Amino acid sequence: MKPVVVFVLGGPGAGKGTQCARIVEKYGYTHLSAGDLLRDERKRPGSQYGELIENYIKEGEIVPVEITISLLKRAMDQTMAANSQKNKFLIDGFPRNEDNLQGWNKTMDGKADVSFVLFFDCDNEICIGRCLERGKSSGRSDDNRESLEKRIHTYLQSTRPIIDLYERMGKVRRVDASKSVDEVFEKVVQIFDKEG
């Protein structure tokens, strides 16, 4: 069985992680966060990628696509090996740019089906406010204003064009993410109920 993938995109602080947790609970998807996989790999003793990942994340830059895809593929393979019924994945925070998308198409062509792109659309200032709030407790090294400005700049420059590209293919399901968590999830449920 091939993995079925929903790409989850949106700026920093759009609520991707929060909403993904709820989708997992309600629809039985497996949530893979590209960022979390990279952060975990960075901490893994003896990782061949650790230091490299650290430098990219600190600079607010996008990690080379080969690394991210190999981590995503490994996670999907492990999940499906453990339970063959679990073939539905939410991939959050990927693809971030054209290079990511080309890398995915090249590596995963015929190996995974992308059913749609879930896009959490949120005003930048709201996103920054949420991240700064989260930074007080998350301990994430990139939840500070300087890193955030860089991340939002990278997102607007690199990720928005990817969303536009999928939009033209009719694959984007857009959600207004500036509303409350419950209101946003209500809209998400409508989308998943319709898409099956």
Swiss-Prot record:
GO biological process: 'de novo' pyrimidine nucleobase biosynthetic process; CDP biosynthetic process; UDP biosynthetic process
GO MF entries: (d)CMP kinase activity; ATP binding; CMP kinase activity; dCMP kinase activity; nucleoside diphosphate kinase activity; UMP kinase activity
Top-rank taxon: Eukaryota
PROSITE patterns named in the record: ADENYLATE_KINASE
GO cellular component term of the entry, any: cytoplasm
Entry EC number(s): 2.7.4.14, 2.7.4.6
Residue numbers binding ATP: G13, A14, G15, K16, G17, T18, R134, K179
SUPFAM superfamilies in UniProt: P-loop containing nucleoside triphosphate hydrolases
Catalytic reaction(s) noted: CMP + ATP = CDP + ADP; dCMP + ATP = dCDP + ADP; UMP + ATP = UDP + ADP; a 2'-deoxyribonucleoside 5'-diphosphate + ATP = a 2'-deoxyribonucleoside 5'-triphosphate + ADP
Cofactor binding mode and count: Binds 1 Mg(2+) ion per monomer.
Residue positions binding CMP: N100
Location(s), subcellular: Nucleus; Cytoplasm
Residue ranges of the region described as LID: 133-143
Pfam families referenced in this protein's UniProt entry, alphabetically: ADK (PF00406)
Positions of region (NMP): 33-63
Keywords: ATP-binding, Cytoplasm, Kinase, Nucleotide-binding, Nucleus, Pyrimidine biosynthesis, Transferase
Binding site for a ribonucleoside 5'-phosphate: R39, E61, I62, V63, G93, F94, P95, R96, R140, R151
Top-level class of the enzyme under EC nomenclature: transferase
Obligatory cofactor(s): Mg(2+)
NCBIfam families tied to this protein: UMP_CMP_kin_fam (TIGR01359)
Subunit and partners: Monomer.
Protein's name according to its UniProt entry: UMP-CMP kinase
Taxonomic placement: Eukaryota, Metazoa, Chordata, Craniata, Vertebrata
Gene name of the encoded protein: CMPK
